[in-house]
Amino acid sequence: MMQQTFDLRLATLAANYRNGNTTPRALLAAIRQRAEALNPEFNLFIHLLSEAEQAPFLAALEGHSPETLPLYGVPFAIKDNIDLAEIVTTAACPAFAYRPTQSATIVAQLIALGAVPVGKTNLDQFATGLNGTRSPYGRCRNAYHPAYPSGGSSAGSALAVALGVASFALGTDTAGSGRVPAGLNNLVGLKATKGVISTAGVVPACRTLDCVTFFSATADEASQLLALVARSDQQDSYSRRNPQWNSRQAFGRPSAGFRFGVPQTLNFLGCRASEALF
């Protein structure tokens, strides 16, 4: 299982591209090979893009660099309830599958910024579930303890980042789907305010609550990604302009003291096994 691993942090990738240590084409080919080796055990991808399917995205990078495209050559994964043009969307239900003619707004934004899709990731069917086990495409396994669940519903997206085949991944969150698998796989799961990231082109679970989320290795990278894509979108009736307080420029230590609470006891509803795992 231990294939070649890569440092896919945004700053490191940009430096490696500038220094000529690798190219987007070479990196994506190596990542595809690693993903193919991992998928039989972890079931993280429903569809891995082939070399031919990735070719247009790589061709669009010609003449560019990290200086002209902030996500130049950055590999990312897409939960398979979010549209990528001409690649089948299943929402983990083969009978529902369709081939979209255009990408979801968020996917189109990221591609325009230079990011390259790796594949469509596995999920609890129709994004309904928090385990990562309710999919006809196989049960997703935890990146650190394969006998444990990955969490869901954005299971494959979390695994793509945790297993080193994507710098970041897109998920969705209606009731925890973008945060639970992040927590179970040692990642940051960013669910922004409803409407800050467009959900146009997303198969709905609950339209009034659905949010597109980011999985990333660090909070700083999640913040960078949010700052790049937070835009209002006329195709999304729930879209809103990004307020200044949601910008990474507004982050920092509070001038006054900050108080937070930690419960003295945790209630696991009588489940001793869960208490022991915690």
Model-inferred region functions:
Residues 2-174:
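Gly/Ser-rich catalytic/binding loops embedded in alpha/beta enzyme cores
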Residues 8, 22, 26, 101, ...:
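Conserved active-site and cofactor/substrate-binding residues in soluble primary-metabolism enzymes
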Residues 48, 161-162, 189-191, 215-217:
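Short beta-strand-to-turn element immediately C-terminal to the catalytic PLP-Schiff-base lysine
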Residues 69, 179-182, 250-255:
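Short glycine-biased active-site loop of nucleotidyltransferases that positions the nucleotide triphosphate
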Residues 125, 176-179, 211, 268-270:
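Flexible loop/turn segments at secondary-structure boundaries
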Residues 131-134, 149, 171-174, 184-185, ...:
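A structural signal for the main folded, soluble domain(s) of proteins
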Residues 132, 174-200:
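Glycine/threonine-rich beta-strand-loop-alpha-helix active-site module
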Residues 191-276:
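A short helix-breaking turn/cap at a secondary-structure junction
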